[in-house]
Amino acid sequence: RQRVESSNAKAKAQISDLQEFVRRFSANASKARQATSRKRQLEKIKIEEIRPSSRQNPYIRFEQAKKLYRTAVTVEGLSFRYPGADNDVFRNLNFTIEAGQRVAIIGPNGIGKTTLMRCLASDLTPTAGRVTWVENAQPGYMPQDPQAEFEAKMDLFSWMSTWTGKADDDQLVRATLGRLLFSGDETKKSVTVLSGGEKNRMMYGKLILTKPNVMLMDEPTNHMDMETIESLQIGLEK
């Protein structure tokens, strides 16, 4: 879709330039042949039709239960080595992330991006150093592989209900599931049979309901279709 939109934009600009040339010089004897040539070029330019997708877009919006100000987390002398390994995955990392900052961890596979994320999320204990979140920080973590989140024998509705904190929030749970394209009998199926993309959508639901003021997302577009990726991008920009 993006390729077609870009191509169409260039074609429209070219059409505009050619039409302007023809308008200005078609009556000019010295430019008549060039104007005729431009008309022929115009006839050959085509604008591709962009057909609307038949797939639905989930509705993804994230809120914060508590607003976070100033510093969110401070990392000091952070090192990590897996048991039995000869080398550290990373060593002596020091950085501070402020509230409102958007930070991307970029690097080749195997460099330790996920390990660092897990240390920040308290999913792994660092070999040395410390991660200090401010008192009001409420991190929400979306792991690269959320399989461990879906091993319990629960249906989708029951799983999502565990993140509301209230026993009478059935309507909120159903609305959240619906916005993530789970409805009707589908909410009664076991979370253990979900596809990778469906698990990710359920994880978005967890973050929507728990309302963290810091989000740690490790490759959150894995297994996702373009409609969901676009919806996630919109949700993160709000």
Segments predicted by a language model, with ranges:
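ABC ATP-binding cassette signature C-motif
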Residues: 1-6, 61-238
